[in-house]
UniProtKB/Swiss-Prot annotation:
Natural source organism: Mus musculus (Mouse)
Keywords from the UniProt entry: Cell projection, Cilium, Cytoplasm, Cytoskeleton, Repeat, WD repeat
Protein name: Intraflagellar transport protein 80 homolog
WD repeat residue numbers: 12-50, 104-143, 145-185, 186-225, 227-265, 267-306, 504-542
GO biological process: apoptotic process; articular cartilage development; bone development; bone mineralization involved in bone maturation; bone morphogenesis; canonical NF-kappaB signal transduction; cartilage development; cartilage homeostasis
InterPro entries, alphabetized: Beta-prop_IFT80_2nd (IPR056456), Quinoprotein_ADH-like_sf (IPR011047), TPR_IFT80_172_dom (IPR056157), WD40/YVTN_repeat-like_dom_sf (IPR015943), WD40_repeat_dom_sf (IPR036322), WD40_rpt (IPR001680)
Annotated compartments: Cytoplasm; Cytoplasm, Cytoskeleton, Cilium basal body; Cytoplasm, Cytoskeleton, Cilium axoneme
Quaternary structure and partners: Component of the IFT complex B, at least composed of IFT20, IFT22, IFT25, IFT27, IFT46, IFT52, TRAF3IP1/IFT54, IFT57, IFT74, IFT80, IFT81, and IFT88. Interacts with IFT88. Interacts with IFT57 and IFT70B.
Disulfide bond positions: none
Function (record text): Component of the intraflagellar transport (IFT) complex B, which is essential for the development and maintenance of motile and sensory cilia.
This protein's GO CC annotations: 9+0 non-motile cilium; centrosome; ciliary basal body; cilium; cytoplasm; intraciliary transport particle B
Chief place where the protein resides: cytoplasm
Pfam families reported for this sequence: Beta-prop_IFT80_2nd, TPR_IFT80_172, WD40
Length: 777
């Protein structure tokens, strides 16, 4: 990726340009110390003077009023705030009329920013004050006051907090009066510029110490640059939070959100005092010290999938290269390319007006449809369909171009959605809520309606990243997510009316990805690269989960690596320095998944015998139990040395009735409650009581015996035997109450038990054929 610089031969301003701001993706306003506000039209390459300000007004900062989200009519901003050296800020219309001038600070007003909703304005000045104003320019509050000038300010993503500079310090102050203020030393020199992105919640800072830094919202440094030759005078996030730009003297740099540099340009600009990204995130404008306005297009983005490599060579041209035969195709577009995604044998490209869908089998005839709103901010792909996110909503389309659905939820803000907060599978869409980060919304892909009974997926901590598995049946769909404590959890998407368990799968997990061909999960866990060959093991037999993992040392990937993709058996990891590392994992677990999904158990056993790996046998054991194939489970457990489980499986085979076998398989997986329910529904009350006795669940055993008026003496006898073994006296009041006047006769109890077993066997042989449903022999 690099920047394609365009700079006019002669500067359009006579003095330094202090600030720039985009109205649309093709129109820019610039303000200069020559008191002129100039409009630039990038389509016609024309400039026109909007207004000449009075000679005592030297503009310092400009910020356009945010356009209404999701309203088609208002496609561009209509007014802006301009801060100036005379201590005022001015509300100016698009045509250049000064609507209002407000005395704001003593000395220059160094920065002014609208919040994301456009309901409040924050200004900072040389007097060290931070002030909040209403939309119409009425003072609401003085948020802070200090002895040094405040050079830069930014709103938090939720518009509830403000970030501002204080010399070498950065301060995050909530608008609520008594809330905790976060303050930390960020640079060794005065901080000149800050920016806070609403999508990734990361902070940028630039200082006179010639460094730029990336921080999280808790003030922890994620990246610190090497010192440059000159102070860093400007930084700005791209709207989607994936890139940022850095400006200095004769320097413009394009960086990834993790800090490493994509491209460095040295235009003849003087210091770049202000950087603005276009609304679609494809181009940058810089306000230059020598009167120029520098424009830079982001080109040469690259997408890879299997043997295809797609490169954006120009604004409207892509090159497709097949690395197997070196065949090259050129794709020409009518408009500027904004976003693209290559996955699942399809390339999806959004331009400013249309969406193009190419198949990797045929690059010549794309499917084209018009977009409702031009600026697509996110494209996600699944095997059957893809998702487009723009300022107006979320839209699901098939690869044939057919519109499928558009999920909606209360308080939806599409401008802050990214690949970590939205996930797509063939049947489900998952979206993390921004208002309450502990909640995940789940939607049916085909209808866009909330999944099942509409109940939200709620977690105890804030969630940072979500991912749906890609294969298998809808009823088995799982979602994995990482919370703010870096714990990895997995849970079922379908709830079936019961409270589904959210189970912890790992700790200190920084990044995760599901395989696109089978349900294998990978992540970087602390200093280990970990692959969960069969994550569902946690629901079946968590004792053997460690045996189903593949682990290798991840220290070679340096700090904060990120998993880019997991295609087939190839995992691609982006290191902190920007380099890509490709890891190949064993292809056999994927083949095993394929055999099991087709119920080819004999082939699965044969494969495990051929591979001779413990992880394969452990996966097969868990898969067999999950699918109720106890014959295969017995072979697999024997292969991993779990002899106690082999014996238990043999004991299950000898049980007389189908229901008992089913209940004991459920118990094997730890589903005690479900096992008991199966037995009670089948009328096998004694067996339900007995499993509670075996588990020493004495309260429940007695409760069932009393409720069904049977085997109370059996429960009391086993309880007494248990107490005698440990030499203890009965203290439970309920047991003491029922034991009064009851004589325990073991002969009688054994006869009753024998009668129950005979009754179950007789009922099973008369009511059922010898074939056992749910248990394969």
């Amino acid at each position: 990726m690099r920047l394609k610089i365009s700079l006019s031969k002669e500067p359009k301003h006579q003095e330094l340009v202090s600030c720039v701001g985009w109205t649309t993706a093709e129109e820019l306003y610039s303000c200069s110390d020559d008191h002129q506000i100039v409009k630039w039209n990038l389509l016609t390459s024309e400039t026109s003077l909007i207004v000449k300000l009075p000679d005592d007004i030297y503009p310092i900062d400009l910020h356009w009023f945010p356009k209404s989200l999701g309203i088609k009519k208002q496609t561009q901003a209509e007014s802006f705030v301009l801060t100036s050296s005379d201590g005022k800020f001015h509300l100016i219309s698009k045509l250049g009329r000064v609507e209002k001038s407000v005395e704001a600070h003593c000395g220059a007003v160094l920065a002014g920013r609208w919040n994301y909703e456009g309901t409040a304005l924050v200004t900072v000045g040389e007097d060290g004050q931070v002030k909040i104003w209403s939309k119409t320019g009425m003072l609401r509050s003085t948020l802070a006051q200090q002895g040094t000038p405040v050079y830069s300010v930014a709103w938090g993503p939720d518009s509830e907090k403000v970030l501002y500079t204080a010399g070498k310090q950065l301060i995050i102050k909530p608008l609520q009066p008594n809330a905790k203020v976060l303050q930390w030393k960020a640079h060794d020199g005065i901080i000149l510029k800050v920016d806070w992105n609403s999508v990734n919640d990361l902070i940028l800072s630039a200082g006179e110490d010639c460094k730029y830094k990336v921080w999280d919202s808790y003030g922890r440094v994620l990246y610190g640059s090497q010192p440059h030759e000159h102070p860093i005078t400007s930084v700005a996030w791209a709207p989607d939070g994936e890139l940022f730009a850095v400006g200095s003297f004769h320097t413009l740099r394009l960086c990834d959100k993790t800090g490493w540099s994509y491209a460095l340009e040295k235009p003849n600009t003087g210091s770049i005092f202000n950087i603005a990204w276009s609304i679609d995130g494809t181009q940058i404008a810089g306000a230059c010290g020598n009167g120029h306005v520098v424009f830079a297009h982001v080109v040469e983005q690259r997408w890879e999938w299997k043997n295809f490599q797609v490169t954006l060579t120009k604004r409207r041209t892509m090159q497709v290269r097949n690395v197997l035969n070196d065949a090259v195709d050129l794709l020409e577009f009518r408009d500027r390319v904004i976003k693209a995604s290559l996955n699942h044998a399809h390339l999806v490209v959004s331009t400013s007006l249309q969406c193009y869908v190419f198949s990797t089998k045929n690059w010549n005839t794309p499917l084209i449809f018009d977009l409702k709103e031009g600026t697509v901010s996110l494209i996600l792909q699944a095997e059957r369909h893809f998702l487009l996110v723009d300022g107006g909503g979320i839209y699901l389309h098939s690869y044939e171009g057919r519109f499928i659905s558009s999920p909606k939820f209360p308080g939806m803000r599409t401008d802050i959605l990214n690949a970590q907060t939205v996930s797509l599978s063939n049947d489900t869409i998952a979206i993390k809520d921004k208002a309450d980060e502990k909640i995940i919304f789940l939607f049916e892909a085909s209808t866009g309606k909330p999944l099942g009974d509409g109940k939200l997926l709620s977690h105890k901590n804030e969630i940072s990243e979500i991912a749906l598995d890609q294969k298998g049946l809808t009823n088995d769909r799982k979602i994995a997510f990482i919370d703010k404590n870096r714990d990895l959890y997995i849970t079922s998407v379908k709830r079936f009316g019961k409270e589904e368990q959210i189970i912890k799968l790992g700790t200190m997990v920084h990044t995760l990805a599901w395989c696109d061909t089978c349900n294998i999960l990978c992540g970087i866990q602390d200093t280990r690269f970990t692959v969960w060959y069969y994550p569902n093991t946690i629901y079946v037999d968590r004792d053997i989960l460690p045996k189903t993992l593949y682990e290798r040392d991840a220290s070679e990937y340096s700090k904060n690596p990120h998993i880019v993709s997991f295609v087939g058996n190839q995992v691609t990891i982006r290191r902190a320095d920007g380099s890509l590392v490709h890891i190949s994992i064993s292809p056999y677990p994927a083949i095993l998944h394929e055999y099991v999904s087709s119920s080819k158990w004999e082939e699965a056993v044969r494969l495990c015998r051929f591979v001779k790996e413990q992880s394969m046998w452990a996966c097969l054991a868990a898969m067999a139990v999950a699918n109720r194939d106890m014959v295969t489970a017995e072979i697999a457990y024997a292969a991993v040395g779990e002899i106690d489980k082999v014996r238990y499986i043999n004991a299950i085979k000898d049980l007389p009735s189908r229901e008992s076998k089913m209940a004991h398989i459920l118990m094997f997986s730890g589903n005690i409650q479900e096992a008991e329910t199966v037995l009670l529904q089948a009328g096998l009350v004694y067996q339900a009581i007995q499993i509670n006795i075996n588990l020493y669940n004495w309260e429940r055993a007695l409760e069932l015996a009393v409720k069904y008026k049977t085997h109370v003496d059996t429960v009391l006898a086993y309880r007494q035997k248990f107490l005698d073994t440990f030499g203890k006296q009965e203290t439970n009041k309920r047991y003491l109450q029922y034991a009064e006047g009851l004589q325990i006769d073991w002969e009688k109890i054994k006869a009753k038990i024998e009668m129950e077993i005979t009754k179950e066997r007789d009922r099973s042989s008369s009511g059922q054929s010898s074939k056992s449903v749910g248990l394969k022999h």
